[in-house]
Amino acid sequence: MGKRVVIVGPAYPLRGGLSTYNERLCKAYNDKGDKAFILSFSLQYPSILFPGKTQYSTEAAPEKIDIDTAINSINPLNWLRVGKKYRKLAPDIMVFRYWMPFMAPCLGTIAREIKKNGKTKIVAITDNIYPHEKHFYDHACTKYFVNSIDEFITMSHSVLADLKKLVPNKPSTYVAHPMYDNFGALIPKAEAIKSIGLDPEYRYLLFFGFIRQYKGLDLLLKAFAKSGLKDHKTKLIVAGEYYEDSAPYKELIKTLGLQDAVIERNDFIPNGKVANYFSAADMVVQTYHSATQSGVTQIAYHFNKPMLVTNVGGLAETVPHNEVGYVCEKDEQAIANALNDFYTHSREAEFSKNAEAFKKQFSWDKIMEAVGGKQQQQG
């Protein structure tokens, strides 16, 4: 008989990478015979705290996934009520997603209530221990959350190191971020380029995902200008919603003379269109100023796309340099040199073939095995 597993975190109708991950993990559990569903949010962020246009998807709900939209992130009475409900339900495992200290009081309180039943194993998949943008309450809130958890899984060694400083004696382990294989099949490049209204005479680099300072779009724009690729029928697609003021970026594009070389698609890219953008690109570029791990990397792997990443956080852990792409320091010239090397030496076919082989290690089974087993202490 399979286990009863509850995944705690965002899910449909909430949109974004966390929802995509949780829904795919839930599917993986059910596919192997467990009974899994998602405990999600009726209110995730108050609208005043959400930087994007909307938190909600306009697409159809994922098939064959049960979702309980019950958690109000800012209502302590709700946390106690939800915790008591799941304490009585007593699933075998509760898998909490943790990504920012704002959620710590809510999730930590629910976890504490559930633990009172003495039966349910409480595991956290920790995307971050500390956020990219710091706040005075980060340490206290995170400490409150981690003290409520039995075992931890991190998806980068840098997060594992942060976790060890907070709770050195709790079981924890590293498992690489699994590959997103739920965005459909690779589309022939010419067809994909046409489908998103671009000129098939050009080659395209892709910057994908919501835009905040730590994502390093400014660094990429400067490097792209330095590379001179705009004069060689190559353009940069920036596909993602601004989560901060777009004016400095637009001014930078103008200052660098890149108005005709940068294609901005600054709405949230729905799941049904992700394949079109990745299939149209020669390489996916992530010039982050800071990072832990990246879901974008695991979408790129699904589509066998070469990648350029900066040497921050856990990005370099999953992109072997000169095999599936480039690992660069946060330096405009180094990034420009790598971009030029990619095209000058026609690296796409080689890197793509290597990505197809390398991606086989990024399975959802590994996450499920880590959740189910007693974790080994890793340093």
Predicted regions mapped to residue ranges:
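Glycosyltransferase donor-sugar binding loop
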Residues: F41-Y45, F208, K235-P248, D267
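Nucleotide-activated donor-binding/catalytic signature segment of Leloir-type glycosyltransferases, i.e.
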Residues: A247-G272
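Short hydrophobic beta-strand element within catalytic cores of glycosyltransferases
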Residues: Q286, A300-Y301, P306-V309, V319
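Acidic donor-binding loop of glycosyltransferase active sites
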Residues: N276-T292, K305
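Donor nucleotide-sugar binding/catalytic pocket of nucleotide-sugar-dependent glycosyltransferases
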Residues: N147-I187
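Conserved donor-binding/catalytic core segment of Leloir-type glycosyltransferases
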Residues: L198-K215, L221-F224, I237
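Conserved acidic donor-binding segment of nucleotide-sugar-dependent glycosyltransferases
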Residues: H321-Q333, D341-S346
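N-terminal strand-loop element at the rim of the active site
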Residues: G9-R15, C26-K88, V159, K164, ...
